[in-house]
């Protein structure tokens, strides 16, 4: 049974990666720009470089993670990102683009992710999830203004 579940997971991930890659190949230059922005944020977070919060997040940011009782703000993001950074390490991660829609100075980006991490007890875990991010372009640069999503429920 375990092998079957792992095979289904592997095929699902491969299909998601292929579908995302195919979609990204037809993206406009501006869509590719916001996808690079997303990738940069994930790289910085994995490297425990929390400067992304000050440079890539709008002061009026609101976000709602799965499992949280209510939306939170930039100060909460900074607080909990610091805690998570001190207590876990990303071993590997990958994000798969699904859609990117841009209207004027607003962009909506949707994607799926997979993360392998290790906590302070040296316990390893792999999770998958999804996000919808809302970006705003001010003074020529994109910033996160909202997002919703997070880890998929474990069965």
Model-derived features with residue positions:
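Short beta-strand edge/turn micro-motifs at domain boundaries
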Residues: 128-153
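A short, structured loop/turn motif at beta-sheet edges
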Residues: 100-107, 123, 135-141
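Short, low-complexity N-terminal intrinsically disordered segments enriched in polar/charged residues
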Residues: 2, 19-60, 155
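A short acidic/glycine-rich loop-to-helix N-cap element
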Residues: 25, 120-126, 154-155
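A solvent-exposed, acidic/Ser-Thr-rich amphipathic alpha-helical stretch
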Residues: 32-35, 49-103, 112, 124-127
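Short beta-strand segments enriched in hydrophobic/aromatic residues
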Residues: 57, 113-115, 148-151
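Beta-strand elements of well-folded, non-transmembrane domains
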Residues: 115-119, 135
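Bacterial N-terminal signal peptides
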Residues: 8-17
